[in-house]
A protein has these predicted regions:
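A surface-exposed partner-binding patch
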Residues: 1-106, 110, 160-242
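Compact, glycine/acidic-enriched structural inserts
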Residues: 109-146
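Charged, amphipathic alpha-helical linkers/stalks
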Residues: 152-153
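Charged, low-complexity intrinsically disordered regions
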Residues: 156-158
């Protein structure tokens, strides 16, 4: 359980890659008002596991990452990809670790790393509990750290290699009913990212066609279509109103 893991790491001795020693401190538990405010923002019920964890702490007072919190850090955009994103950690450089909270969900895993440079979404961990364990397992800038591996290796691999994406034509002929239904509504130049069963190394370059990449999600399924943005008219076309 997440609550038990949080209790077990309180006061844990952490040594960074420069040899500096700190001891992990937890923030106080959530107040009743904080719980009510949180529940008012959610698309569904607050999972029992998260409620129990919030009775232990709302996050880390210090620690390897810039921040880790069980109360949504907010600040993350990309609503077309994640209608109900829940930010639980931040690296201090505009990148977040988020949960894809779905209406009616009783389990808030997995954790995704949402990076803006490169513009990639990457699978990080199967659950918040595993993510917490990974945070304290090794300094985030240590090559052995699962956090470092995604932060420094996986995102660049996903940015340069799009072989896991499915062409619309192939998806439209797939025996997978959900994938096929999604493809039927997409233009032929679309490619689809499928993170319904994410594994280490999974993800997609949400900005593969630049900052104006068109992102379309298939309901609450973890399926996203990426297409090129409409071409901007050239100078003479704008000049003569073409």
């Amino acid at each position: 359980m997440l609550a038990d893991t949080l209790k077990s790491i309180a006061g844990q001795r952490l040594v960074d890659t420069d040899g500096e020693v700190t001891h992990l401190e937890l923030l106080p538990p959530a107040t009743d008002q904080q719980i009510r405010d949180l529940e008012a923002k959610l698309p569904g019920l607050l999972p029992d596991e998260i409620r129990a964890a919030l009775a232990v702490t709302t996050g880390f007072a210090n620690g390897p990452l810039e921040s880790f919190a069980l109360l949504d850090l907010e600040g993350f955009g990309l609503d077309e990809a994640f209608p109900y994103p829940y930010s639980i950690a931040h690296d201090g450089f505009g990148n977040y670790w988020i949960l894809d909270v779905l209406p009616g969900a009783t389990d808030w895993g997995p954790v995704f790393y949402a990076c803006h440079d490169p513009a990639v979404i990457a699978y990080q961990a199967s659950s918040i509990e595993q993510f917490v364990k990974d945070i304290v397992a090794a300094p985030p800038d240590d090559a052995r750290s699962p956090i470092n591996h995604v932060h420094e290796t996986v995102v660049h691999a996903l940015w340069s290699n799009h072989s896991a994406l499915v062409d619309q034509r192939i998806a439209a002929a797939s025996p997978d009913v959900t994938l096929r239904e999604f493809a039927e509504y997409l233009p032929p130049d679309a490619v689809i990212a499928d993170l319904r069963d994410p594994r280490p190394g999974s993800g997609f370059a949400w900005g593969m066609y630049g900052p104006r990449t068109n992102i379309q999600r298939f309901g609450t399924h973890r399926l996203w279509a990426l297409t090129r943005p409409p071409a901007k008219p050239g100078f003479f076309a704008r000049l003569f109103g073409r």
